[in-house]
Amino acid sequence: MGKFNSAVITPVLAAGSVASPYFFQVNVSQRLCEKSCVESQPSFVPRFSVKSVSAVGTGQYVATIHIEGVIAYTPCNGNVCCTKTQLISQDFTLPFTSATVPTAVTVVAGVSVNVIAGSMCQQCSRNFVSETPLTLTVA
């Protein structure tokens, strides 16, 4: 059985988001086990939860966020009835500032946009990309 790489998770803080609630755009990139049709829409509804909060400096904190979800996609083998799935279950961090010690930190996800990324001439690709807006509220 082959070894699969972890997803690359890249959170970006929205411009102007300097106080709670903080707004992030989270990009999840994952190499799929099998090639998928670039034209087919993969399904991925990630769940996000706050795992922990750590102080890293005066007024500076890092929230460890857990993401979990299943990517469902149609492989490029002509068999539309044969959907494949691949699990993502990982942690990533979101930095934030707070003048007081946080007593509660929550995360809420917006609607994810999912694609199979490929070049113009490619009909199949293993590159799955998902974008999800997140709101991090600190109290």
PLM region spans:
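Viral structural modules
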Residues: 1-139
